[in-house]
Amino acid sequence: MSEPVAQAAAVDTAAEAPPESVSFIFFGDAGTGEPDQFAVANAVAQWCGAHPCRFVALLGDNFYPAGVRGVRDPQWDRKFEQPYGALDLPFRPALGNHDYYGHAAAELRYRSARWSMPARYYSYREGLAEFFVVDTERYTRREQAWLERALAASDAPWKVVYGHHPIRSSGEHGDTPELKTKLAPLLDAAGVAFYLCGHDHDLEVIDAAGTTPMVIAGGGGAGLRTLTPQPGSVYAESVLGFGYMTIDAETATVRMIKTDGTVQFERTWPRPGAGSAR
């Protein structure tokens, strides 16, 4: 049986820093300990050696096949610390369904120079953006209420939400009906700039008129799967890789990058409310 898991937290990571642009990495579905995970990790390290990187948003399914057994589980070394040893960056994780197959609470208790996850769902500020991490495996009414309050209280020019499951997806798992009904309207109403996720093992960008752009970066190292692009999908590819986002005062640029460093997709969006319409 899973252990009790703490609920929500806010992490103040920019209390002493003035508002500024921020660039970060995001990917999920990574924790296999196999060569493909190391290939993505090495590609991220090479990219961040040539480009500014503030942190990594880890999008869930952090440990395959069944989470971790505790904070001393050898998987921490084999499937996290070793693959990302060349990255001197903090990781800000979300929980995925495979994490719940083990003791999800251990992922909250574990601490290292790279890993810090204060709660099942939480928020933190980095420069011009505030990030809201959601638990989509157990998306409760309490969590929905927390997210609604947190988004309303935020004064950040940019708001980014991320979790594990996609709201919409062209991959094998497809759309998540509960998130389409509950989460999507909240993101649209709150002026959220992006929703980032994994779960489907591919890279995809969905940018449908009138909705929050959604970026799937499930190419972190687990086995790839087929996809069939749906309406609104502007990029979809079954390939290992990661996302890279740069946010400045008025624009945000998303790049989707393969393990050989090739930028497969790049697009720039204006800040929500800065003369743009959904």
Predicted regions and their residues:
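Residue-level detection of beta-strand scaffold positions
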Residues: 25, 132, 158-160, 254-256
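Residue-level marker for buried hydrophobic side chains located in beta-strands
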Residues: 24-26, 56-58, 93-94, 161, ...
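Generic beta-strand structural signal
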Residues: 26, 58, 125-126, 208, ...
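A short C-terminal boundary segment appended to hydrolase-like catalytic domains
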Residues: 238-278
